[in-house]
């Protein structure tokens, strides 16, 4: 009789205790406890001078079973934007935009994190800074779709880059302007 009376009480207490401990700890696919303290890693990323070093910090995080969170990825995007180059000696054909897009892809497909407005803002800032207004238009569209808007100052700066390219005659890539137009070709 006593077992029937106390059984629901003990079961609910045990279930509440288990739920409290499992909510505080995260486990990976293989049952190992995952470290969720990303603050020291973010500090390491912020101290990196080149963005290749920040990538190494992300690798070390994964090795230490501490998967990056959205704040870590955003700190890495900021590092890519602010660093002068990938390495101490510039690499041929390096592209900060490509590095950022690669990181966003890793976020989404590997760690199943959706980039937020801050993530896309760093990419848009790089488009404006590098003068790549066409890519800026694309990122603006993505931000309007995903984040419901793009910062007005970045939109204005991107438009200024487009107008500057138009006045300099560089609105379209040079190799396209050298080709004959479809309607300019005379067929005999």
From Swiss-Prot:
InterPro entries: TPR-like_helical_dom_sf. One of its GO terms (cellular component) is proton-transporting ATP synthase complex. PPR repeats lie at residues 36-70, 75-109, 116-146. It comes from Trypanosoma brucei brucei. Mitochondrial membrane ATP synthase (F(1)F(o) ATP synthase) produces ATP from ADP in the presence of a proton gradient across the membrane which is generated by electron transport complexes of the respiratory chain. F-type ATPases consist of two structural domains, F(1) - containing the extramembraneous catalytic core, and F(o) - containing the membrane proton channel, linked together by a central stalk and a peripheral stalk. During catalysis, ATP synthesis in the catalytic domain of F(1) is coupled via a rotary mechanism of the central stalk subunits to proton translocation. It is a peripheral membrane protein. Keywords: ATP synthesis, CF(1), Hydrogen ion transport, Ion transport, Membrane, Mitochondrion, Mitochondrion inner membrane, Repeat, Transit peptide, Transport. Disruption phenotype: RNAi-mediated knockdown of the protein impairs assembly of the F(1) component and slows the proliferation rate of procyclic cells that are cultivated in vitro in the presence of glucose. RNAi-mediated knockdown of the protein also slows the proliferation rate of the bloodstream form of the parasite, despite the fact that the organism can profit from blood glucose as source of energy. Mitochondrial membrane potential is dramatically reduced in the bloodstream form that relies on ATP hydrolysis to maintain mitochondrial membrane potential. One of its GO terms (biological process) is ATP biosynthetic process. F-type ATPases have 2 components, F(1) - the catalytic core - and F(o) - the membrane proton channel. F(1) has five subunits: alpha(3), beta(3), gamma(1), delta(1), epsilon(1), plus the additional subunit P18 (Tb427.05.1710) that is not present in F(1)F(o) ATP synthase from metazoa. Subunit P18 (Tb927.5.1710) interacts with the alpha subunit with a 1:1 stoichiometry; the interaction is direct. Subunit gamma is part of the central stalk. F(o) has three main subunits: a, b and c. Its main location: mitochondrion. It is found in: Mitochondrion; Mitochondrion inner membrane. This is ATP synthase subunit p18, mitochondrial. Residues 1-18 form a transit peptide.
